[in-house]
């Protein structure tokens, strides 16, 4: 987080009003219109209204309190992947409704409405790209699509991405954010836990690196499978990470849980994650970890008699 005023920019609504007073008065209607048009973003933690352009420049981390606001998959890819290196995978895969599930509405209708609203086919985007020049396979979950729930398409896309990474000998990074398995797909969604885990085991057997990044929230079947299978497990500050929800656990145990229960900081203290990395440092941290695990180039194998011959020649 920047400390000097120059880098902080228009950090709050008070700064904006101060600037407007200097540049001349504006109507209240215009001010309200600019807020409604998305020029401002209200921090869900401290309530400060920040200029959206400045907030995006700080990767949606509140300049006032450091709260990590939720970001969509498009923004996350822009933050991590080098320009003009992103190659999406399996964009043609679409979810279906094999169980003809219905709760308050048909699952097929819910899918169509969500797809039309946010422009995504399902809750994950996968692809190949580069981080600081290093090739990786990246999966990014999107909480806007039915709470980032894991259905058949999410499982299939992640599995195919991991298999491609194994074939190409790429490290895998998955940005996790999910409420868990998608109940509308029943057992089919639960099967994705085993399928993704099996693909990750083959990736591990090939001695390749896998780093999950746990963001707010990461819960349910995602936590119980691929989110916790990394060689190095990273988390964002204050992220909620767990299996069952806090309210469910409190009702089951009939006792109040600690305030920091199921937070990234609590999991770090108990050894369930390896490090907590602020979003503004995530790209460089991933690049450093991937670079450390790149295969070391060794000279071609040389038989003993050739070594002896070279040694004796040098001595002469």
Swiss-Prot record:
Its EC number is 2.1.3.15. Residues 39-308 form the CoA carboxyltransferase N-terminal domain. It is an enzyme of class 2 (transferase). Pathway: Lipid metabolism; malonyl-CoA biosynthesis; malonyl-CoA from acetyl-CoA: step 1/1. Binds 1 zinc ion per subunit. Its cofactor is Zn(2+). PROSITE patterns: COA_CT_NTER (PS50980). Zn(2+) binds at residues 43, 46, 62, 65. It holds the Pfam family Carboxyl_trans. GO terms for cellular component: acetyl-CoA carboxylase complex. The keyword Cytoplasm applies. GO terms for molecular function: acetyl-CoA carboxylase activity; ATP binding; carboxyl- or carbamoyltransferase activity; zinc ion binding. It catalyses: N(6)-carboxybiotinyl-L-lysyl-[protein] + acetyl-CoA = N(6)-biotinyl-L-lysyl-[protein] + malonyl-CoA. One of its GO terms (biological process) is fatty acid biosynthetic process. Its main location: cytoplasm. It is found in: Cytoplasm. A zinc finger (C4-type) spans 43-65. Keywords: ATP-binding, Cytoplasm, Fatty acid biosynthesis, Fatty acid metabolism, Lipid biosynthesis, Lipid metabolism, Metal-binding, Nucleotide-binding, Transferase, Zinc, Zinc-finger. Component of the acetyl coenzyme A carboxylase (ACC) complex. Biotin carboxylase (BC) catalyzes the carboxylation of biotin on its carrier protein (BCCP) and then the CO(2) group is transferred by the transcarboxylase to acetyl-CoA to form malonyl-CoA. Belongs to the AccD/PCCB family. NCBIfam families: accD. Acetyl-CoA carboxylase is a heterohexamer composed of biotin carboxyl carrier protein (AccB), biotin carboxylase (AccC) and two subunits each of ACCase subunit alpha (AccA) and ACCase subunit beta (AccD). This is Acetyl-coenzyme A carboxylase carboxyl transferase subunit beta. The gene is accD.
């Amino acid at each position: 987080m920047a400390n000097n005023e120059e880098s902080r920019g228009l950090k709050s609504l008070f700064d904006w009003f101060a600037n407007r007073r200097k540049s001349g008065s504006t109507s209240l209607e215009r001010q309200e219109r600019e807020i409604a048009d998305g020029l401002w973003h209200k921090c869900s933690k401290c309530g400060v209204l920040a200029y959206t352009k400045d907030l995006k420049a700080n990767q949606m981390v509140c300049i006032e309190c450091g709260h990590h606001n939720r970001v969509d998959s498009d923004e996350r890819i822009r933050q991590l992947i080098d320009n003009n290196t992103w190659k999406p995978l399996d964009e043609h895969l679409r979810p279906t409704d094999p169980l003809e599930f219905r709760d308050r509405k048909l699952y097929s209708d819910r899918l169509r409405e969500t797809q039309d609203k946010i422009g995504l086919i399902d809750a994950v985007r996968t692809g190949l790209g580069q981080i600081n020049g290093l090739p990786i396979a990246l999966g990014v979950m999107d909480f806007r699509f039915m709470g980032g729930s894991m259905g058949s398409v999410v499982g299939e896309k992640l599995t195919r991405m991991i298999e491609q990474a194994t074939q190409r000998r790429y490290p895998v990074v998955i940005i996790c954010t999910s409420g868990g398995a998608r109940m509308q797909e029943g057992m089919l969604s639960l099967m994705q836990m085993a399928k993704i885990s099996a693909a990750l085991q083959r990736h591990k057997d090939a001695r390749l690196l896998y780093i999950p990044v746990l963001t707010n929230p990461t819960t349910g079947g995602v936590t119980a499978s691929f989110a916790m299978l990394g060689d190095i497990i990273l988390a964002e500050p204050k992220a909620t990470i767990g299996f069952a929800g806090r309210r469910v656990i409190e009702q089951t145990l009939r006792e109040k849980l600690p305030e920091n229960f199921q937070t990234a900081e609590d999991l770090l203290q108990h050894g369930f994650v390896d490090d907590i990395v602020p979003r503004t440092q995530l790209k460089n941290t991933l690049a450093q970890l991937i670079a450390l695990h790149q295969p070391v180039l060794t000279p071609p194998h040389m038989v003993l008699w050739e070594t002896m011959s070279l040694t004796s020649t040098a001595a002469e």
